[in-house]
Regions:
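Membrane-interface "cap" regions at the ends of multi-pass membrane proteins
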Residues: 1-21, 76-77, 181, 217-221
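Juxtamembrane transmembrane-helix boundary signature
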Residues: 13, 40-72, 81-89
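Flexible loop linkers connecting adjacent transmembrane helices
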Residues: 25-30, 53-78, 103, 251-268, ...
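Helix-loop-helix module between adjacent transmembrane segments
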Residues: 47-55, 77-97, 102-132, 187-188, ...
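Extracellular/periplasmic helix-exit of transmembrane alpha-helices
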Residues: 47-61, 202-206, 211, 231-262
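Hydrophobic alpha-helical segments and their helix-loop junctions in multi-pass secondary transporters
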Residues: 144-171, 186-202, 359-368, 393-401
Length: 401
């Protein structure tokens, strides 16, 4: 029962793991290659568990988020460079999330993309500025649950080949021309803003930093929360690929579906109108919830620049949210092709991710920062290997898009 009371921070992070960018990548994977790329969801989830647990570890042991720790322990010029790029990454993330919500509004109500983006922006800002963290946490848990049930419904009415799926989850496969999709699945899972966010929101669970027994207990509960939440994310991402594979994939004439609106429309003649409506409604929930957490991440990063925690009543946090969400919506509003802007935003995330990951590993490996809770040699090696793999794959993604 203690664990159930602790559950929450990991699910907020999971929202970034099932955001509209993941939807597009997963549907492209399932429609183009059937069940063959399910293994990439498994691999990326395992890597994500290591990285997110490590970020939360920092927050529990130090009482500081990744942004605050960088401000405290790195030279000013380096800290400013890292956190400035992290803020830009938060903007790029928010743009993708807002756009996903706008696509859902268009699918459900015929609202134009640019107007829909402004509606999502207003909804998200109202939610963030009028809600305490605990209320947002409960809201996100409800949204994640509804998204999960939505895909249970989609999988239930689709004709899944479970034998092929079981093989796909564990057997690496590299079908011809699949590398861009493989890379996009990974790139949509490990995201910079989530590392900052997790290290901050884990501190919503109060503890005594002077009590080693309390810290050990918090670390145990945090890992269970992270593991449980990432498994939920793995299941939802897998369900997206399963649904796309069962519905859209044609072995003799494979045609990749990489547009969310098109995917929603194609579901109607194949699975019925209810499937299309549920798909769009779940996308709307994903867009709103991931936009909220992207704004929170921006508030966390910006507050940390001034060595302050995320606190919605503080001007630093509010400015951080506004500096994340308004530019993201403005880009959608001002450019001719929002989806072209989305492509460039994802490319920037791929370039920024190594900066955040290696900064985190440096800080959590430092005895000056973490004391006796610094990363062990084996954990350093594992984290460094994951960081190198993620970095190389994200760099490769820049050249194959």
């Amino acid at each position: 029962m203690n664990f159930l009371r602790y559950l929450g921070p990991g699910l907020l992070v999971t929202v970034g793991f099932i955001d509209p960018g993941n939807w597009a990548s997963n549907i492209a994977a399932g429609s183009g290659y059937g069940y063959e790329l399910l293994w990439m969801v498994t691999l990326s989830t395992i890597m994500l568990i290591f990285l997110q647990h490590n970020a939360a570890h920092l927050g529990i042991v130090t009482g500081k988020c990744l942004s605050e720790a960088a401000s405290l322990y790195l030279p000013a010029w380096l800290k400013n460079t890292i956190l400035a790029t992290a803020m830009m990454a938060a903007v790029a993330t928010a743009m993708a999330e807002i756009l996903g919500g706008a696509v859902a509004l268009q699918m459900l109500f015929g609202i134009p993309i640019k107007l829909g983006s402004m509606i999502i922006l207003v909804l998200v800002l109202i939610c963030e500025f009028t809600s305490a963290y605990k209320r947002i946490e409960k809201l996100i848990i409800v949204f994640v649950s509804l998204i999960g049930f939505s895909f249970l419904f989609e999988v239930w009415i689709a004709d899944i080949d479970w034998a092929q799926a079981a093989v796909g989850w564990v057997k690496p496969s590299f079908p011809e021309h699949s590398m861009p999709v493989i890379l996009s699945v990974l790139g949509a899972v490990v995201m910079p803003h989530n590392l900052f966010l997790h290290s901050e929101i884990i501190q919503s669970r109060q503890w005594n930093l002077e009590d080693d027994e309390m810290i050990a207990r918090q670390l145990k509960y945090e890992f269970k929360d992270t593991l449980f939440s990432m498994i939920i994310g793995w299941a939802i991402n897998s369900a997206m690929i399963l649904m796309a594979a069962a519905t859209f994939f044609q072995p003799q004439n494979a045609k990749q579906v990489d547009d969310l609106a098109t995917a929603g429309k194609m579901l109607t003649p194949l699975l019925g109108n209810a499937a299309s409506v549920v798909f769009a409604a779940a996308l709307l929930l994903a867009g709103i919830s991931s936009s909220i957490t992207a704004g929170m991440a921006g508030g966390t990063i910006f507050s940390g620049i001034f060595n302050k925690p995320y606190e919605i009543k503080s001007k630093e946090t509010r400015w951080g949210i506004l500096l994340t969400m308004i530019p993201a919506a403005a880009v959608i509003l001002l450019i001719d092709s929002p989806f072209q802007g989305l492509l460039y935003s994802q490319m920037f995330l791929g370039m920024q991710l190594p900066i955040t990951v290696f900064t985190q590993i440096y800080l959590t490996s430092s005895k000056k920062v973490m004391g006796k809770y610094a990363n062990s040699l084996r954990l350093k090696i594992a984290l460094f290997a994951i960081a190198v793999i993620v970095t190389l794959l994200n760099i490769a993604l820049l050249f194959v898009q």
